[in-house]
C-alpha cells in the first residue's frame, strides 16, 4: 500500500461528503491511503456528546456507506466517533 498523501482537493472532498451527513457536527481528522486505483479512509467524525452508543454507531455506518458509495473510488472507510467539543 502506498503511503503517499493524496492531493488536498481529494481530502477536502472526503471531508465534505462526511460533513454533510446528518448527525456529523465536525471532522476531527482524516487520513487517506491509496492502493492501486482505490483509496482507504480513516476518518474521525464528531457527534453530539450526549449521543448514545447506538446513535454514534448508526452515524458511523451511514458515513461509511456514503463514502464507499461515492464516486471517489473509496474501497473501505473506518469511521471513528468522537464527541463534539463543548463550547
Where in the sequence are the language-model features?
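Alpha-helical transmembrane segments and adjacent TM-loop junctions that form the membrane-embedded core
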Residues: 1-87
